């Protein structure tokens, strides 16, 4: 099929689209290169073949797949372009419709979609959530490298006029300084996701600093483009373009933003956004790109600004991501990155090294200035050395996101092909080396290392208790309040400070964020579950006669990174214990219903990393229902503590001792004693010290104490099953180091290892009981 277009009165431009295959001319099979569709198909096949082959080797040494995209472009570059040059004459007599036309269109489309989706998934609000330090770093990291502008006039005598005129050479140096000074937020976000530290304190700091820097960069880009138009084109056109940009911002903020909010408001909760609105938003993003091109601005600015306006997360943000992310990230983005790298001719760096060596010097100088500036600020604000260096490297990271800028200035002839090739190779080295260096020097687990005692056992007897509770689903609210009611007391000398954290799986945004409900964000209050839960906790606080204070937060986070948000908040709130639901769900009759594997995995991560003690609550239903029933008797909640021995049991004992001030709770401590020699004398001494005040009935009237002698594992199991029928809630330690040999025979039958041996027995599916269980692990002290 041929398309013929008449242009003016003197030239015919034809463009061959589809062919009849290789058999169209068997003597010359390369005839297919004269048709755009077969050529595009061959290009895409070669691109993904080289990507797959490159990644097969690079993934063995931990290099990200993005580097494979770049290397595929370098492999295909000069060789493929030779083929394209041969095909251009066959494809079209119009030089604009050469062999790269179709591939370039896909590349631009991919770049637009990627920029739009990344800004939709990236919340700029993160810039204001980490205090003063990221703001200072963001500003300094942008302006400090501009100091290198003072070196622009060095070695101007050595500029070869055949390479570039003096004015253009100085403009090229200026472009390098500006592009290298800017830190693109999507680039920072990508490396943090790759390193899986986006939820860490370091990740939040880097994101915030990058957001500030990126805002300054966008403003500088608009000013620089307007100035270039003013100087090289026309004063009137420059003013027109600037006014057009201002009008665009006004339309976006006062027309498009309210329309987006209207779409969100009219979408029922838990219902998808209608396709017509999704398509309208996408078309608006494309229209904004065309608008900016018409007014001589970078086309990516339009989708970027449109993406910023769209609220992250459900319903609209997540709908856009679900509909377009896979196609963009798995098809269009690889083609876009590879196409940009295909334009890189590494041989030009060698042949024109004397012409670009000063550009290389400027790039490295800016890198050093940025590293030193960020490192100095981080050390000044008392960050550890390793974290300071990691932040500096992350903010100096260059990757495929910068290709948009490089290609734009190349097409406008602000930089040469040799400089472009160097910048591509520089980004390739940065994308491959920086993640491995940061990974080797920074472990996110170190964030939660705590050398101070952060448990209940070591609290002062009359000090307040700080607890962090986590909620996954609406049914977690009642069981959590029921547990907290055990500590409420009319005695105000023993206050309880509760931090409630709603855990929301991140779907439509890329940046995790923790929001305090004291700020009354509209979108959060429109979530009926969270709003209702907050009202329930507020009522609980009012009914507790000021003995309990409750602060609520919501964490939007990725499922596999939620433990980092929990640990960070636990550190910030100086909590002594984190309480999380087990993930095992029961029916109203106490029958097993389901297991939440994601919740169980989260609990295991917390057990390994928590900076304080942790409790896992298994609620069969009766405990939470009974806590709301007011009994005429003094006690209506029976809590049993099964004490075998070890630090976790001592922590569990310290916890229940704080329940004795609640007149509705009766606590019984049952100690199981094995009739053989104790393995650890020191643990035995510590156990007796913790139980000493309970053994004396005169000094302790609120907690009952009893001992049972067991001779075998079978008797332990029978004792646990009998106790499960007597109490509403059983509190047990997770590990029992002292008697590991006695309980070792049960470990191979454990279904829920995060609950330990005894906890697993009490939470077993076939246990004919309605008892709820709290499994306690004392803070894992790091050395």
Swiss-Prot record:
GO terms for cellular component: membrane. It is a multi-pass membrane protein. It is found in: Membrane. Pfam families: CHX17_2nd, CHX17_C, Na_H_Exchanger. Its main location: membrane. Specifically expressed in pollen. The keyword Transmembrane applies. The chain crosses the membrane at residues 31-51, 61-81, 101-120, 135-155, 175-195, 205-225, 244-264, 276-295, 300-322, 360-380, 389-409, 418-438. GO terms for biological process: potassium ion transport; proton transmembrane transport. Keywords: Antiport, Ion transport, Membrane, Potassium, Potassium transport, Transmembrane, Transmembrane helix, Transport. One of its GO terms (molecular function) is antiporter activity. May operate as a cation/H(+) antiporter. PANTHER family: CATION/H + ANTIPORTER, CATION_H(+) ANTIPORTER 10-RELATED. This is Cation/H(+) antiporter 11. It comes from Arabidopsis thaliana. The lineage of its organism: Eukaryota, Viridiplantae, Streptophyta, Embryophyta, Tracheophyta.
